Amino acid sequence: MRRFVTLLIALLCLSATAVQAQVEIRAPGQQTIAVANTQLVPLSGTPLPAIAAELHDVMAADLELSGLFRQLDPAAFLDDARRPGLTSSRVDFNQWALLGAEILIKGGYQLQGERLLVDFRLYDVVHRRLLTGRRYAGLRRDVRTMAHKFADQVLKSVTGREGPFSSRIAYIDNRTGHKELYLMDTDGANALRLTDHRSIVLNPDFSPNGREVIYTSYRRGNPDLYRKQLSTGQEARLAFKKGLNIAARFRPDGREIALTQSATGNPELMLLGTDGSRRRRLTSHWGIDVDPSWSPAGDRLAFVSDRQGNPHIFVMDLLGGQTARLTANGKYNATPAWSPDGKRIAFTRLEKGVFDIYTVRPDGTDERRLTFGPGNKEHPRWSPDSRFLVYSSDQDGRKGIYIMRADGTGIRRISAGGGQCQHPAWSGQR
């Protein structure tokens, strides 16, 4: 497994409230924040244009995806952008202000053998001061992770919420001829195959701490539930009752797993311990109950049931036992995903032979359609900060993994290669 970058030093982190007093926070689609994203300069030794360009380009792509920033043309940048020195006293704030910059990203790097040291700084141009800084140390191969991590900090500095760019996405890819589990960065880089079951693997989900992934595999002929430790690669079979053991989801506190099993003859929602031991049966109904998704507090479950004829989204209160139908429209609603901030539930709906993605409040109000156009858009999952959704789509003719903002804008395909990709899951922060 790819080694995580070590964060050595956190420098002068200002509070979110201080930053909000300097830069008005705008939602995607509203007036954006003007950012000068400069290429990092060598702290010592020979300039390495490839490293500088990669750090800059990864950061630029992350900031563009957020929808919060307007990036100034680097061709207009000053000599100040190429000067060494990262203290506020070395920044020509007057000249950056004349260019229209509201915030400024500068930094430096140093490569010694395979060891890479990167310093980032984020400045408030309007008030002429440092907002935040980070120093990262790792290997040359960690350069993209370092840029993602600082992009997370840029979002935190201007919104109060850390970005999701250094998290990861699990998904299913059949590039080998079999549906196997893969892992990639949020921009599609560093794709890594996690299983070699030579069978069908489906429905991955990350543990809340991001250290494990659970998934269903037909490796032994039955759809059994497996768990894999990402740091060691160790795999264990958790649930293997005859029939279905599918669509498993970790409870937000990481102590239990909800899934669908059909050992009783009818697909029902069950609650298991993380060791696979059965805790209790959650549903007992003639209809099919599948695709559970936890509320952030872990006290409610959204799920799909055809108990009223057609597949619809329902919400179950685990404390009181009451169940209420969430979706009022459409004849086929599926794959609910509760946002980490608790404000919205994403799901797919089949209309006129095509699946599209919608969101709705947990009380069933304010339904919004997010996707349009040709092709199916399925299996939505939220980013850990609730700003984005990842999903699978065949809109380009071949199933791939896509990311979009929570309002449906900024659609970007992130998967590559010749396989058909589906069933994405988004990890928490790392």
UniProtKB/Swiss-Prot annotation:
Signal sequence span per UniProt?
1-21
Q: Which UniProt keywords apply?
A: Cell cycle, Cell division, Periplasm, Signal
Gene Ontology biological process terms, A to Z? cell division; protein import
Keyword Disulfide bond listed? The answer is no
A Pfam family matched by this chain, by name? TolB_N
What does the sequence similarity comment in the record state about its family? Belongs to the TolB family.
- Protein known as: Tol-Pal system protein TolB
Q: Which organism is it from?
A: Syntrophotalea carbinolica (strain DSM 2380 / NBRC 103641 / GraBd1) (Pelobacter carbinolicus)
Quote the gene name from the UniProt entry: tolB
